A protein has these predicted regions:
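Short, positively charged and aromatic/hydrophobic N-terminal segments
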Residues: 3-5, 12-13
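HKD-type phospholipase D/PLD-like phosphodiesterase module
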Residues: 26-27, 41-78, 93-296, 335-397, ...
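Short, surface-exposed connector motifs at secondary-structure boundaries
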Residues: 80-85, 296-301
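Generic beta-strand/beta-sheet core signal
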Residues: 86, 118, 175, 182, ...
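Short, glycine-rich nucleotide/cofactor-binding loops
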Residues: 89-94, 303-311
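Residues at the starts of beta-strands that form the adenosine-phosphate
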Residues: 114-115, 299, 322-328
Length: 484
């Protein structure tokens, strides 16, 4: 019988641990962890990374998308020195306009306040996928600047010459000395402005050192680049005209790392290591993700919105399973994917994407069924009415956590510019907060008992079946997975 776990039982009790700890590691591929460490021997393990020490009392977890929205608006209203908001997009809808109006109101009340928004260059200048063609959110930015003044800079950040090949995916809002870290962007569903919402993780951290460190990449590396241009003032150059600048900018980002003064973690404190990454070579965030998984001894929780694990992550998870580690993967059901189209609605090609992810998950579960049956691998699918799922990150044993916008998929691994915060908690000061967060997430999940709990391709809508078969026939499914 497959046991069902809440957050506390998952962390407090593992029926496999006593027997697995008494046995030597499996002989299957016994040198995988050793090979990884040998190849990356210059890379420090998570516990040895330099960190910014902060009081555990200055770290809090917000519970809902509404909390995220209300906290953001309150912080904007109170800010006295700076507001720097990086997001994939700030949408032209009620939620996005509410945030932008709050920024203009704060600037009017305190003219000395420095306010800048950073969005992806390409995403800001196109309409929504699957919708009618439009000039994108940049039209709203210019309209509000003409009406309310140009005191707010909204920068378009081009990571690549084409959106398909990479986007600006940096997270972490900086408001004075506070960092509001979430994978969420700024629109109706992320902010739960109306009835539907898109759930994410939301963390509030008060630290001048962390805020300064994360602000530097925005106010210097981004804003001062010749590839980055304001979208709400003056004329906007064509992407082709800044081609060389974009290439140089991406090259600089691939070498970038956060700079900060590290200090020792004292009683009552946790350590936070900000990480930055772009591309597959020298990517510190990617390395940290794999290192954290390999470091897991007893329990690993992995959040991902789209099941399409990069090869290094999949191999690390398999290694931990073979060595007795208890693994929980929490992801969205295909109906909780933002590209899901109900069978009752007209089908569009983009609607096949959630089914491709589910097919990946089905293959993954089928080949690891023995771990699922033993209760060692727990797969939880999130679904709540017609809302959507966007969580990502890691919880490792009781000492480490990762907050990130990285979807832990090949696209994030290779193409997009990402960041994250590695939390080192040697005194377990945040454990109860992590457990409470996990319980809230699991409340709307169902646990898979077998790969057969998932739909097979034969039950998919006919247009989806045709697309998947066509991709498989020319072996394009693997290529598609690299950019999803």
């Amino acid at each position: 019988m497959i046991p069902t776990y809440c957050a506390e039982t998952f962390y407090r009790y593992n029926p496999l641990m006593e027997s697995s700890q008494e046995q030597p590691p499996s002989s299957a591929r016994p040198t995988l962890w050793g090979n990884w460490r040998e190849k990356n021997r210059h890379w420090k393990t998570p516990g040895n990374l330099s960190a910014i020490a902060i009081s555990a009392e200055n770290f809090s977890v917000l519970e809902t998308p509404q909390d995220y929205r209300e906290t953001l608006l309150a912080l904007i209203a109170k800010a006295k020195q700076r507001i720097l908001l990086p997001a994939l997009y700030l949408e032209d809808d009620d939620g996005g306009r509410e945030v932008l109006a709050a920024l203009y109101a704060a600037k009017a009340a305190r003219p000395e306040l420095k306010i800048a928004v950073f969005v992806d260059w390409h995403r800001a200048q196109r309409g929504l996928i699957g919708k009618e063609k439009s000039a994108g959110n940049a039209v709203m930015y210019r309209e509000m600047a003409q009406r309310l003044g140009s005191g707010i800079a909204i920068y378009g950040v081009p990571v690549q010459r084409r959106e398909l090949m990479g986007v600006m995916h940096i997270k972490g809002f900086i408001l004075d000395d506070t960092v509001l870290y979430s994978g969420a962007s700024l629109n109706n569903v992320y902010l739960h402005r109306h009835q539907r919402y898109r759930v994410d993780r939301y963390h509030l951290i008060r630290s001048r050192a962390l805020a300064d460190c994360m602000a530097a990449v925005l106010s210097r590396t981004f804003a001062e680049s010749s590839a980055v241009h304001a979208l709400n003032t003056g004329s906007i150059p064509k992407t082709a005209d800044i081609r060389t600048a974009i290439i140089e900018f991406r090259r600089d980002l691939a070498k970038f790392h956060y700079r900060f003064s590290a200090n020792q973690i004292r009683q009552g404190e946790i350590g936070i290591t900000p990480l930055f990454g772009l591309g597959i070579r020298g990517n510190k965030l990617n390395r940290a993700i794999v290192e954290m998984i390999y470091q897991a001894k007893n329990r690993l929780v992995l959040f991902t919105p789209y099941f399409n694990l990069p090869g290094p992550v999949r191999r690390a998870v398999d290694d931990r399973l073979r060595n007795g580690c208890h693994v929980m993967i929490v992801l969205g059901d295909k109906t909780a994917n933002d590209f899901y189209i109900s069978p009752n609605e007209p089908f569009k090609t983009i609607g096949a994407v959630p089914y491709l992810y589910e097919a990946n998950l089905r293959r993954f579960c089928k080949s690891r069924q023995k771990f699922i049956v033993a209760g060692q691998l727990n797969i939880h699918l999130w679904q709540h009415d017609d809302n959507t799922f966007h969580l990502k990150g890691l919880l490792v044993d009781e000492h480490y956590a990762l907050l990130t916008g990285n979807n832990i998929n090949p696209r994030a691994w290779r193409l997009d510019v990402e960041n994250g915060l590695l939390i080192h908690d040697p005194q377990r000061l945040l454990l109860e907060k992590h457990l409470a967060e996990l319980d809230r997430i699991l409340a709307h999940t169902r646990q898979l008992r077998s790969h057969e709990d998932l739909e097979s391709m034969e039950s998919y809508p006919l247009p989806v079946q045709r697309i998947i078969k066509r991709l498989a026939r020319v072996r394009a499914d693997r290529l598609v997975n690299q950019v999803l």
